[in-house]
């Protein structure tokens, strides 16, 4: 909640902080930076620590790369990395002088909700933003309302297009 979801969709200081406080008020113990199976086992939490239940929140999955030349150049990020950097460095706040790198023109490859979030975030950082997707608009996996908002905000779409190299 803190890192991958843009501020414009989920205000951290208001919504996330209040949700965490309400969960803690219910008596839930939150442990972060724990690697299940390494630093602690599920069995030890249930048997030795006396927990009645364990929730494993594994976070977002690993990004999928296209295996094309140039995709590991400086300034090329996975959408999750870009969103995390933006949130951690509070680039969405005008009173912060955040050194996040977003070029004057940004291309986001993909058509899911995370791609829409990354594109809309880049737009808010002042970039002319285009979403490139290999299929038709009807086949976009993002929710229709996310696509609508992206278009409404001025994001361009290049459909039936797939990059072969980053130059």
Language-model segment annotations:
Residues 16-65, 71, 77, 81, ...:
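A Rossmann-like FAD-binding core segment of flavoenzymes
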Residues 110-112:
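Glycine-rich Rossmann-fold phosphate-binding loop(s) that bind the pyrophosphate
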Residues 115-116:
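N-terminal Rossmann-fold NAD(P) dinucleotide-binding loop
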């Amino acid at each position: 909640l803190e890192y991958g979801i843009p501020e414009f969709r989920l205000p951290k200081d208001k919504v996330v902080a209040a949700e965490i406080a309400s969960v803690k008020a219910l008596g839930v113990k939150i442990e972060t930076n724990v690697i299940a199976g390494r630093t602690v086992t599920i069995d030890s939490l249930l048997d030795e620590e006396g927990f009645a239940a364990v929730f494993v929140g594994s976070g977002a999955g690993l990004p999928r790369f296209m295996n094309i030349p140039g995709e590991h150049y400086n300034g090329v990020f996975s959408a999750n990395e870009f969103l995390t950097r933006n949130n951690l460095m509070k680039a969405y706040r005008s009173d912060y002088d955040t050194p996040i790198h977003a070029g004057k023109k940004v291309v986001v490859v993909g058509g899911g909700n995370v791609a829409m979030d990354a594109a809309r975030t880049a737009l808010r950082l002042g970039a002319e933003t285009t979403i490139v997707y290999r299929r038709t608009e009807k086949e976009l996996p993002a929710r229709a309302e996310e696509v609508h908002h992206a278009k409404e905000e001025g994001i361009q779409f290049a459909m039936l297009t797939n990059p072969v190299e980053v130059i």
